[in-house]
Amino acid sequence: YRVRYGRRILNRDRTVDFSIEGDSALGVISYNLNGTFVVQVRDTFTMDVIDSIGFSKDFSSLMTRKVKFVRTFNQNNPDGYIWKISAMTPLVGFSGDKVSLSSLNIFSVNASTDSINGINVEEGNLLFTLNSSEIGDLFLDRDNLPTFDAFQHIMLKIAVENNGPEYALDSVGVGEWVMNRYGRSQYQRGRRKLNDKGIGVDEIVNDNIHAGLWRIHGPGLGQESRIFRSFFSIIDLATIFTEEGGYNCYTLSIPYKVARRN
């Protein structure tokens, strides 16, 4: 059978707290999400839903980020100025206290070939990094966001913490899944699962570092560059595979730019 899961958001509240000092302002934006987490199981032969195995559970999630604004002269505004976003921190969301992110590292990829192993992929230069201690105050300049070449291959390594008890699906003992998605508006695409099973670019089995490759998409038809949002989600497996396992999830969202190579 095949397991599918997703969130049905029923209520979304946003609050913004501002503090102004001279020509700069700081906004703390919080989102409170409430809804239903749905797990659906289908027979892979008939694709019929197996109602006796699927379930749903309520969830709530808090997401926050800080945004810096600067006062900018604008003669078309009656006040003579407007507030423009200059920088923002990553958006961080969590439900429960079981799983969290320790660090995120993004590398370029070095690929080589040999007659025995075929294509070998190795970690290249470090392109972006952050750790849990700095996320809340790591301001990303709007004019200097992490930038990747269109259709470039990159390597993701995400270190996680799982406070347990862990629910594992096999003898490897990994108790969480780590997903990567991207989007421009409310729509998120390209869900891709990283792994901690020592497969592919993951080097060590169950060391709490999930790794994977991601081929960056293009900026869009007729666009030379464009800004997107990445979403890195950590979800405890007991959330997906047990009805009584609660809802424990951690999400990190970072804006980034995709540009065509000249």
Cite the ranges covered by each PLM segment.
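Solvent-exposed serine/threonine-rich low-complexity stretches and specific carbohydrate-binding patches
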Residues: Y182-V205
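Outer-membrane beta-barrel domain signature
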Residues: F55-S56, L145
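Acidic/polar, low-complexity intrinsically disordered N-terminal segments immediately downstream
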Residues: Y1-D48, S56-D58, K66, T72-G80, ...
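Short, aromatic- and glycine-rich surface loops/edge beta-strands on solvent-exposed regions
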Residues: P219-E243
